[in-house]
């Protein structure tokens, strides 16, 4: 029995130890830094919870499965960790790799780097291209010499201020605006940062810097850089720099990039004679003279500026790469001496002569698309070319390119040129000049205006003049291993001489003019009573000829002198309200809408207020003077009907006239009240003041019944009679209409709203917080200890 009890006690103690050690591994992350160890073998995927990281650690630790267990000794063997581009989202578990000196978590999806905070043996960290914003966990890693964090979401770099052993720090493509934390990192030799920085003053003491990249910031003042005399490389692209004077002292520079700034004057660069790599693209530079002495240059980028003269480059014979694209170049002869060039860009310029490149036999890549080059015979000896881009030029003959057998990339599309003009005739024929690399003619793909092709000529039969004809070509070509489509459009202008006749009221003169030219304007003709308007392509109407811009068309034309007739004003007066029309002499007036006037009929427009002559808008013509026409009216007559109990008489009266009052009618037993505009009630007509309206009316005779005394019977009170003879019935009480006891006030509600206590919804009903959940472990351990003590006591008593 005692042995069984001992076995039971041992089992409990073992369970406590196993449970406790498991909890220690899972909770040690939140305790003291010294607890970042595991006390027993643990599966890899329990230490490194991120699936991708667990898979990587399985390989690093030499295991076959992520469920395999490892010890702290195993973890301590890991000193470097290359885990880039694995899609890792969490680095939990890395805190147990206490001997790490180098890590690479680049190109993952990290946001939290807390597990690194106590890995003080780290000397190099690469975590670019993640989503990291908080770098506080790096604050104590003072052994770091290299830190790469570009392309993250970092704003605050203050945690780096004590990392004084850093000699490489890469912080580009973040949201950093303040770099004051860097001022004490005087061991830095390589530095790049931010994209919102404006002030470079914190760099003043970093005199050991050799490579500095301040690209994509908002920097305009670079005066502090004059103190960094050890700089060998300065990259300052995409800023707001216009003055580079402070760079004149940095004579150790061998690489300088100022691409994408606001530079016009580059005179300071003349002193930087150690430069081998210079990028000045995307600025406003036109004068290259300061570069003439930079003879060590091997790479020079000058694209997208305002350069037309490249003669200062003629002596830079060490150049291997030269970019001159997107400028204003026509003459490229100075590059003929740059015989070490292997890479040359000339696209988007105005170059027609490419022959200066003929001596550049080391060229491997040549780009001159979007120029005006027609002759490529100078390229025949450039047999080292492997990339040729010559689209959008005027090339018609590919024969000179046949020997460029090393080409792998080729562009010859969209050529376009215009031939010299030929005289127009009904039948036009021109030779086809487009040849492929074998010298064979390439037949047209399309021909305008119904043209036809019989090798070697393209022919058009033109029934009427057209200013140009054209044809296109398109054929796949292969040169070396490069294949492209050689395509383009050829335009043939046509010119012709045509007659222009000038007509002045039947008289004409004739001149010959070449189509497309401006006409010489004749002297202005004169016509009595008219003003000369100009020359038009029709006797009336038409389009006026503009001698400054209109060019002779491709046919005979007639131009007519047109004159404007003097115009006059007709005023229409309607009782003082006027409108007007302007009409040419002898022109017809447009009849206005007939005006209206209450009670009147419009008679017409007259040349006098009263009387005068009526204007006939169909035949009367505008005289040679201004006129006024007056609206005249005649008053309308309306009928008044007098109705006496259905019998009527009438009167005809003009609008606003007074009616003659008829004799008062009589009616037995009644008294005549007057004439009203309604049979009953209505308004009584006042014959002294009321005027005839603009409509017929009816007036009704109204009477009042004479009063009659009724007999008195039975003591009843007779009904009263009103003035109109109507009996007024006695008032009647309406049943239920007594409102004397009705209250009109609002009754007070006997129900009140009470906020009763609700034990199920009360916020105070929940239990208070008792502390963190780790107390459960200690309660369990306590209970087990008490149980053990009780068992031991019982055992001791039993042994006595």
Swiss-Prot record:
Effect of residue 781 to I: In strain: H4
Segments forming domain LRRCT: 416-505
Effect of mutating residue 292 to P: In strain: F4233 / Serotype 1/2b and F5782 /Serotype 4b
Function: Mediates the entry of L.monocytogenes into host intestinal epithelial cells; transformation with inlA alone allows L.innocua (a non-invasive species) to be taken up by host cells. Binds to human receptor cadherin-1 (E-cadherin, CDH1); the chicken homolog of cadherin-1 but not cadherin-2 function as receptors.
Family matches, as SUPFAM superfamilies: E set domains, L domain-like
Keyword Metal-binding recorded: no
Reported impact of residue 594 to P: In strain: EGD-SmR / Serovar 1/2a
Recorded consequence of changing residue 192 to N: 40-fold increased affinity for human CDH1 domain 1. 6700-fold increased affinity for CDH1, better adhesion to human Caco cells, 1000-fold more virulent in mice
Localisation per UniProt entry: Secreted, Cell wall; Secreted
Source organism phylogeny: Bacteria, Bacillati, Bacillota, Bacilli, Bacillales
Keyword Transport carried by entry: no
Factors inducing expression: More prevalent in stationary than exponential phase (at protein level). Levels maybe post-transcriptionally decreased by InlH; disruption of inlH in some strains (EGD-e and EGD-2) leads to increased levels of InlA (at protein level).
Reported impact of residue 729 to S: In strain: H4
Protein name: Internalin A
Signal peptide residues on this chain, from the entry's feature table: 1-35
Source species: Listeria monocytogenes serovar 1/2a (strain ATCC BAA-679 / EGD-e)
Propeptide stretch(es), residue numbers: 771-800
UniProt xrefs under PROSITE patterns: GRAM_POS_ANCHORING (PS50847), LRR (PS51450)
Region (Disordered): 705-757
Annotated LRR repeat ranges: 77-98, 99-120, 121-142, 143-164, 165-186, 187-207, 208-229, 230-251, 252-273, 274-295, 296-317, 318-339, 340-361, 362-383, 384-405
